[in-house]
Amino acid sequence: MSLLARRALIRALFLILLPATSVAGTRPTHEYDLKAAFMFHFAQFVEWPPEALPDRNTPLTIGILGEDPFGKTLDDIVANEAVRGHRLLVRRFQNVDQVDSCHILFISPSESRHLESILSHLDRRSVLTVGDTKDFAQRSGIIGFVITQKRLRLAVNLAAANAARLRISSKLLRQSEIVGPLRVQE
């Protein structure tokens, strides 16, 4: 494991073991540095069905749909890294039709107005959807980054994870808020 990846993992582990991470007074760049570390961390604490990663030659792909808020940070963290024998690969997409080979997909805030159609396109596919738009997990995304009281927290939609046939580690779930879908008021 490279020094940069090790530092990112240590930072992510430290942050995940705290009840919440303070982002008070941080620049957006720093916020997305933390989120990039979490994205790497998610790859280690989620299990995909065998057909999603059929052999060791299949890379575990982290995708970014829409505008990229991470810059080079995510690429630097996963460079020369592997999870369960699968090398990590970062790809950027402008269209949801391109993301079929992704295992983790960060849906950028730039795509928020298309979120329902994006999630519908990915329905029942083994893609860990991650985002930071308002109510992301409640709107059927799997992991949402939430800032509450100036702290970075995770919201996890277990029903969406189960539909995607993804198994999320209890270690990650213990540090997350478990949420369900938003109910439409009539």
Roles of regions detected by a PLM:
Residues 2-186:
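Short hydrophobic alpha-helices and adjacent helix-cap/hinge residues
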